Amino acid sequence: MAQEQTKRTGGGDEDEGSAGPEAAGQERREKLAEDTDDLLDEIDDVLEENAEDFVRAYVQKGGQ
């Protein structure tokens, strides 16, 4: 005997209206994640090139 599987999604007519804000929110999260990754990569590059200067400047500004 073969069993048939069905996939249910959403609530019918409301799919188009509710997908808009969720899709926009997802795009915003992806953009923020991408921006954060870019910033962290930039920080890594600076630290690789002149970590000593970075640490010295940080300590002079009151860091511990």
UniProtKB/Swiss-Prot annotation:
Taxonomic classification, please?
Bacteria, Bacillati, Actinomycetota, Actinomycetes, Mycobacteriales
Please give the coiled-coil regions recorded for this protein.
Answer: 24-52
Consult the record and explain the modifications the protein receives after translation: Is modified by deamidation of its C-terminal glutamine to glutamate by the deamidase Dop, a prerequisite to the subsequent pupylation process.
Q: In which pathway does it act?
A: Protein degradation; proteasomal Pup-dependent pathway
Q: Which InterPro entries did the record assign?
A: Ubiquitin-like_Pup
Source organism of the structure: Nocardia farcinica (strain IFM 10152)
Task: Name the keywords, alphabetized.
Answer: Coiled coil, Isopeptide bond, Ubl conjugation pathway
Q: Which family does it belong to?
A: Belongs to the prokaryotic ubiquitin-like protein family.
Specify the signal sequence span: none
Entry protein name: Prokaryotic ubiquitin-like protein Pup
User: According to the UniProt entry, which residues carry Deamidated glutamine?
Assistant: Q64
Q: A GO molecular function for this record?
A: proteasome binding
Q: What GO biological process term is on the record, naming one?
A: modification-dependent protein catabolic process
**The cross-link Isoglutamyl lysine isopeptide (Gln-Lys) (interchain with K-? in acceptor proteins): at which residues?**
Q64
